């Protein structure tokens, strides 16, 4: 399991970049099992909602079960972007919660340019557009946006393949 790997490999943090759940109709028992798994590690876990587990008015992350989440689980909920600071790691994590998976949603929009001397990791859940892509997809992420991103590391979610987009 991913949680076991974080502990075994001595990871500083667990990043969950969207689509942790396939849809918002997941039973509470599954959500409780997820929270129990996260509670097994001492490292912080940061979760960014994606297109399958949106952060909207009916979000599963707003259910009662998440009112009792472990202290190490941090959920990005701001749809215009949010930075979480982890001073003990000299690290800030920024992301933009997805409220709607449409071409109008730009996952990297609003990333802060001001730095406080910490490393900055950005989380973005969307469709990476190669230069030769002709179609307009929802939640687009374009190469110039990545090149201009003022972060030290960008963790992308949504695609199910390994691609270096640096």
Predicted segment positions?
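Acidic/histidine-rich helix-loop elements
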Residues: 1, 22
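Glycine-rich, highly charged phosphate/nucleotide-binding loops
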Residues: 2-5, 30
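Active-site metal-binding motif and surrounding structural segment of the metallo-beta-lactamase
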Residues: 4-16
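His/Asp/Glu-rich metal-coordinating catalytic cores
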Residues: 13, 24-166
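Active-site rim/loop-helix segments in enzyme catalytic domains that contact anionic ligands
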Residues: 19
């Amino acid at each position: 399991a991913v949680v076991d790997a974080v502990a075994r490999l001595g990871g500083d943090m667990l990043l969950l970049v969207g689509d942790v759940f396939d849809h918002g109709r997941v039973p509470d028992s599954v959500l409780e099992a997820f929270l129990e798994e996260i509670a097994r590690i001492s490292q912080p876990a940061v979760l960014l909602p994606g297109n399958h587990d949106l952060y909207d008015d009916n979000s599963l992350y707003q259910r009662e079960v998440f009112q009792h989440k472990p202290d190490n689980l941090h959920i990005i909920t701001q749809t215009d972007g949010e930075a979480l600071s982890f001073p003990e790691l000299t690290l800030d994590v920024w992301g933009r919660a997805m409220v709607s998976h449409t071409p109008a949603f730009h996952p990297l929009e609003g990333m802060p340019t001001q730095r406080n001397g910490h490393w900055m990791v950005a989380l973005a859940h969307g469709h990476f557009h190669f230069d030769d892509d002709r179609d307009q997809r929802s939640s687009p992420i374009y190469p110039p946006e990545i090149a201009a991103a003022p972060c030290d590391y960008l963790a992308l979610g949504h695609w199910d393949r390994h691609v270096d987009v640096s």
